[in-house]
Swiss-Prot record:
Organism: Homo sapiens (Human)
Upper lineage: Eukaryota, Metazoa, Chordata, Craniata, Vertebrata
A Pfam family assignment: HAD_2
Family: Belongs to the HAD-like hydrolase superfamily. CbbY/CbbZ/Gph/YieH family.
Primary gene name: PUDP
Any one of the GO CC terms: cytosol
BP terms from Gene Ontology: nucleotide metabolic process
Keywords: Hydrolase, Magnesium, Metal-binding, Nucleotide metabolism
InterPro entries in the cross-refs: Gpp1/Gpp2-like, HAD-like_sf, HAD-SF_hydro_IA, HAD_2, HAD_sf, PGP-like_dom2
Keyword Metal-binding among record annotations: yes
Induction description: Inhibited by low concentrations of calcium.
Binding residue positions for Mg(2+): 14, 16
NCBIfam families linked: HAD-SF-IA-v3
Biological function: Dephosphorylates pseudouridine 5'-phosphate, a potential intermediate in rRNA degradation. Pseudouridine is then excreted intact in urine.
Active site annotation, chain numbering: 14, 16
Name recorded for this polypeptide: Pseudouridine-5'-phosphatase
Amino acid sequence: MAAPPQPVTHLIFDMDGLLLDTERLYSVVFQEICNRYDKKYSWDVKSLVMGKKALEAAQIIIDVLQLPMSKEELVEESQTKLKEVFPTAALMPGAEKLIIHLRKHGIPFALATSSGSASFDMKTSRHKEFFSLFSHIVLGDDPEVQHGKPDPDIFLACAKRFSPPPAMEKCLVFEDAPNGVEAALAAGMQVVMVPDGNLSRDLTTKATLVLNSLQDFQPELFGLPSYE
């Protein structure tokens, strides 16, 4: 059972599946590849790789499903297919409302995503204005991010770049993936989890708060200004 919410001053957002509806696109593409080998890219497999860097995720998929290809081949083929669909990614319900609300009230917030720069540019091509509202953005290929989630590197790097940097316990992370929740907790931060409905509920127990949608977030629970 997670501790009750404590007041925070700074917010850090994951991107895939939380702010942008990209996880669905990953599922479609990986299932397409798995079909060739009569394998199923199930939610059990997906929950192992969500939030991980591309090569690491590919190796897990290959090991679990016993696909006869190298991780490099899987990344290359999936990236080619994903390039075609990434620009169609839509914002998740409630994302824009929350970000505009935080901006209006001068609450500092940043983005921490495992996506590398090329992938980030494709995914956000339709939403440049939205992502320009963030104080800074830390990507998965950032030199300070030695280890992907569930290690805390990306959230620690992101918190340090606020000016001035807050205490870690004053940061609230928003995540959709179990690996991301683990990473936030390892960084000493609280975490709001907005899991996909298909994710096993056993994988949501560690979060400070679990929501069905960003639309359900009540900022005042964490000492932030409430919606008007």
